[in-house]
Amino acid sequence: MQRVREYVADSPFEYQKNCLLYLPKDLKRCRRGSQEETEMIADHIHSLICSTYGHTLVLFTSYHLMGNVYQMLRDEIPFPMIGVWRHSPEEITRFKQTDNAVLFAAGSCWEGVDFPGDMVSSLIIVKLPFAVPDPISEAEKETYDSLESYIQSIIVP
């Protein structure tokens, strides 16, 4: 058996100084997919985008919800809004070339997209993406005392 070596490099990014995690405390419980839920999400997104003067990437797990929120905000946001409905390098390039832009995205924009510098100063994640369970992860989940302990240990490290 070969020896495995590991090297963990320090990040040049100072997370403590440069990041803020915002979790709204005033979220109401709404029926999933309801108009009330969509309006509540749109209101929070509107406030956050305006407080950062654009420069925002808004990630959704649902194209349907993304489209509804986009439609609600398109005339309300004072910054250029760009929506990526499927993998669209053209729209991502347009976002990179547009000052103070806001990019609404789902699917392919969750991984492998680079926005260097201050192009994105605010990242809004509407809902965390959870992968479709597979037999191995299901068996692993059963080794935990509760679903909450599994989520805290594996899903949200």
Predicted regions and their residues:
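Short coil/turn segments at secondary-structure boundaries
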Residues: 6-9, 61
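Conserved helicase motor "Helicase C" RecA-like lobe of SF1/SF2 P-loop NTPases
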Residues: 56-86
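Conserved RecA-like P-loop NTPase helicase motor core
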Residues: 12-20, 24-36, 80-82, 86-157
